[in-house]
């Protein structure tokens, strides 16, 4: 069904960047992606991409790396679908999903109805991302915590913000952040590079770097975007330069870029559910946006192991 899904993506620009066919081509490593689709009158009216993996005897649907959300999507045409129609289309998508031992997906925030999945035996937990509506940048800046504003001004006096650059520097700085916390980096460089090349080819990303007069890189980040929203995707700081405020400055510059260059009104922080990170999102004035994590475990063995 991948060819039909590719056509669906071309015909429906509201499909988020994470669910675009070319994006899935780049990030679906150690497995394969496909899509359930519903066709009516020779048109795809509903689609649901998924990433199928195998581990030992188990087949399961999971989230690819670098993919914040997937889920079901409906064709945009004319009046919105009624709840009855939405239930019917979602039910048809569910029926086309392959038989697997386990399923887990994070649905896009645009999906507000998971009831058909509940009726089919799926479960869900509510998760949160944080978003800004960029109607007025002055208002957004005024809504930022005063300590954050001081960090922005402090960094502006000590570093320059560069756009573009190379993915190797982003990887190096991001890895420093994980090393500082004694955490394993969840991806390898070759996958990040393939991911970044796809984004660059489709003009769907910008890189930001904070560099001081000596050439030292304090912070790095990446912003990815689609037709509606920009997402603060990957970021990191040099642990020895964290107090410069450069990471906060890069976040503000990404917000400005979203409004002033991309002309988009929605900025998504891509989470976070982590308490210390969530606090920073709120200090930028961002508002909670719920989304669904939906799962189902069909294998008795996996259910027993999950007790």
Regions found by a protein language model. Give the residues of each.
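Short, conserved charged micro-motifs
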Residues: 79-85
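Conserved acyl-donor/pantetheine-binding loop and adjacent beta-alpha core of acyl/acetyltransferases
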Residues: 54-71
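Aromatic (often tryptophan-rich) hydrophobic motifs at membrane interfaces
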Residues: 75, 91, 195, 201-306
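Short, high-confidence coil segments that cap the C-terminus of an alpha-helix
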Residues: 31-33, 99-102, 205, 262-264
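Conserved beta-strand-loop-alpha-helix junction that forms the acyl-donor binding cleft
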Residues: 105-113, 269-276
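A conserved beta-strand-loop-helix scaffold within acyl/acetyltransferase catalytic domains
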Residues: 1-41, 47-57, 108-243
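Short, surface-exposed amphipathic charged segments that create phosphate/polyanion-binding patches used
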Residues: 144-147, 303-307
């Amino acid at each position: 069904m991948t060819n039909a899904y590719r056509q669906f993506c071309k015909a429906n620009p509201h499909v988020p960047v994470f669910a675009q066919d070319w994006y899935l081509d780049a990030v679906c490593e150690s497995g394969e992606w496909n899509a359930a689709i519903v066709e009516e009158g020779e048109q795809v009216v509903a689609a649901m991409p998924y990433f199928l993996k195998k581990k030992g005897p188990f087949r399961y649907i999971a989230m690819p790396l670098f993919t914040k959300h997937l889920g079901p999507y409906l064709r945009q045409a004319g009046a919105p679908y009624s709840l009855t129609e939405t239930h019917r289309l979602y039910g048809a998508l569910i029926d086309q999903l392959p038989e697997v031992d386990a399923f887990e997906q994070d649905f896009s925030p645009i999906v507000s109805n998971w009831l058909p999945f509940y009726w089919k035996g799926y479960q869900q937990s509510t998760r949160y991302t944080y978003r800004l509506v960029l109607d007025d940048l002055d208002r957004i800046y005024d809504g930022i915590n005063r300590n954050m504003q001081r960090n922005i001004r402090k960094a502006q006096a000590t570093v320059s913000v560069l756009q573009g650059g190379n993915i190797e520097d982003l990887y190096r700085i991001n890895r420093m952040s994980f090393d500082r916390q004694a955490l394993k980096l969840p991806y390898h460089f070759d996958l990040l590079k393939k991911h970044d090349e796809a984004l660059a080819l489709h003009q769907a990303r910008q890189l930001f770097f904070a560099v001081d007069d000596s050439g030292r890189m304090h912070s790095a980040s990446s912003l990815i975007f689609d037709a509606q929203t920009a997402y603060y995707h990957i970021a990191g700081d040099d642990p020895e330069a964290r107090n410069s405020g450069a990471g906060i400055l890069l976040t503000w510059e990404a917000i400005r870029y979203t409004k002033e260059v991309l002309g988009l009104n929605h900025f998504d922080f891509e989470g976070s559910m982590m308490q210390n990170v969530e606090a920073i999102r709120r200090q930028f004035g961002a508002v909670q946006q719920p989304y669904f994590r939906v799962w189902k475990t069909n294998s008795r063995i996996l259910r027993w192991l999950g007790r």
